[in-house]
Amino acid sequence: MAAVDSDIEPLPRGGFRCCLCHITTANQPSLDAHLGGRKHRHLVELRATRKAQGLRSVFVSGFPRDVDSTQLSEYFQAFGPVASVVMDKDKGVFAIVEMGDLGAREAVLSQPQHSLGGRRLRVRPREQIEFQSPASRSPKRVAPDSHQLIKALAEAPDVEAQMVKLVGLRELSEAERQLRSLVVALMQEVFAEFFPGCVVHPFGSSINSFDVHGCDLDLFLDLGDLDEPQPAPKAPESPSLDSALASPLDPQALACTPASPPDSQPPASPQDSEALDFEAPSSSLAPRTPDSALASETLASPRSLPPASPLQEDQGDGDQGKAVELAEALKGEKAEGGAMLELVGSILRGCVPGVYRVQTVPSARCPVVKFCHRPSGLHGDISLSNRLALHNSRFLSLCSELDGRVRPLVYTLRCWAQGRGLSGSGPLLNNYALTLLVIYFLQTRDPPVLPTVSQLTQKAGEQVEVDGWDCSFPRDASRLEPSTNKEPLSSLLAQFFSCVSCWDLRGSLLSLREGQALSVAGGLPSNLSEGLRLGPMNLQDPFDLSHNVAANVTSRVAGRLQNCCRAAANYCRSLQYQRRSSRGRDWGLLPLLQPSSPSSILSATPIPLPPASFTQLTAVLAQVLREALGCHIEQGTKRLRSEGGGPGEPPQGGTSKRAKLDGQKKSCEEGPEEQQGCAGEHGEDGVEEMVIEVGESVQDWVMRSPGQLGELPLMTGKHLATREEGQSGTAALAKQGPRGPEAACEGSQAEAEKRVSLTVSWRCALWHRVWQGRRRARRRLQQQIKEGGGSGAGSGAEWLATEAQVTRELRGLSSTEQRPEAEPLLTFVASTSQADQSLTVTPLQDSQGLFPDLHHFLQVFLPQALRNLLK
């Protein structure tokens, strides 16, 4: 119990943090459930096992270099049973011997002198290191709030300077780039011994100009034609670069070591030679840029890396011979992918100094061999059939060379997406997809910032085809005309948020080759979409036209992306974004880059609703919230609202002003800025919101509206200021602008009706945790009804009555009792939109941190409730 107490840290407002698992729980029941869960119990057992192993182990050094683990085991067995022996594989200067019990360890330590092979051994107790739980596999969202970052960005004169400064804080230093070049050269030297003529190409973030501290090292091993006769492979000598990589970022070693082995083979073609996008390190190194708090991973030193297990350390002993045997077996015949991956893995384990944790992943979309390099602290992977990714990396590098605004914009948006929980693995956007989204956006500006891939192909000169796909584009950016678009970075960032918030991600295909959105409904051209898998978000690879790089993104993540972009676009219209604060407040990029809390991330996550007419949905939703869950729904008044807001939350301090609208129709002749629905202008446009009293139909309000739909003001979006009183129970009726900048203003009423979007919102208050223990209470009530001879909830009315009774039991109140006068436990705004048939829930007051639990309950309960009442 004492160990459990030391792992748990109480938090304000009744929460708890488990320091062992690095998670936070909202209340005591959630904590109890976590402590009894499999993850926590596994880590507790693992910690106890590691501690017991440490208490039974001794540290041994001073033995001859030719002594192996078997000889050490035989020697120490004279004092008692030996559980394992872990050797220092790289240097062979020490070993950790784990005895079978504490008595054997004490016998070893009580011996005054040990000797083996004529050498005196130094034996001492193993140092006890504090247990650290394995790194979480969830996407890391490191808060960009370090003192260095805040100071650097706050002191910048404007937003553009902040974005440029952000690049300098996140990108790799010159020393880090040279270190990666040395690792690539080391790999080239080793693999050339087994596969003469092969070339190791770096790709991905290491060469695409969007690198960050700690990014992985992606390598493509180009083996050429394996059908050609190959000389017999031999075990390579110790690479000459091993000494240079003995200690990470050693200036002397880096300065005196060539970037590529002198006997390495030249690239097979001029195109391949451009992949080695680095020069030999000079004799003087630029000072290393300090790691930023924005980095998703940090460059680890050998000391900070976790020790390898005995199994991992011992695996390398026979891998060198195994690699030679596999290479002999595969010589003269075309190897299958799995066997070749195993061969590459064996070479890494047995022949590359400092490499550990080698793992082959043949089931990936592109089979790879993952590895870690201990001296440099780098994580990487090697692929054998990913030549297309090499050209993708060169294309991204070309885009960054064509316009200096590309890198600051990509770095800023990657950091913003990371803080919002939009980028990562699983159903989230990966960095490659997010970068392509930015490039597509820049292609669609007027005038364009970047050319389309088709335009680049026409100017390529030489045609390059990879796996049947046309990968032709100029390699030299100086051969292309610069863009005539001179918009500042701050404006482009605001326009990006505004555009993405109104793009039809599901109904269109964003094509970088054509530089436009292709409608999915009308059918896509076969030459542009054959084999393409469509989904909630469709973003086409620039070369592999059958690959949707956002195919993994779910509808929930796509909806959250647009909601976050809408909130960010609202913030970019405020003075807080445009001007430096004279009061020392966060301004410009800082509010955008602050990581979202779990509640704000959930509030941007839409809850999908079953198909039904919007009028039915709103009526049934209000009924479920009020009767089934016991929410008190407050009524509001008619209001005029501006689009001001904050990045994910309403602004504090009144930085946005409300603008009154005259309701008159805007003319199409006002200029191109007004015609572009996602131009991102910093205007004072507003949205007129009309209150619908509880029980009043949205359709009735539309029928009684004094103006025609075509007379409503032309708007680009809407925003609900949730912290204002009296805005609940409202329906926002806004005529949205065209979907893209190329759309023209249509004056007909039919077109205006298509652009009308209805949004109904309720301000709800809860005094009791009606979601906690609900299933148990429902089963108990159903059992009572069954014992009394009643029937189950068959119709929608019976189901609603049952749920209302469950709520009353959970509240401990009678059906006639009024709500108490005390402050509510939780208040929130529930808002449903006709455009996407979904519900968003935004917390207003949540002093106890209960909103995540409520949102999780509503995700399951509300869709099922609506299906029961609408059937």
UniProtKB/Swiss-Prot annotation:
A zinc finger (Matrin-type) spans 16-46. It is found in: Nucleus, Nucleolus; Nucleus speckle. Phosphorylated by CK1 in the proline-rich (Pro-rich) region. Residues 596-871 are annotated as: KA1. It is an enzyme of class 2 (transferase). The keyword Magnesium applies. This is Speckle targeted PIP5K1A-regulated poly(A) polymerase. It comes from Bos taurus (Bovine).
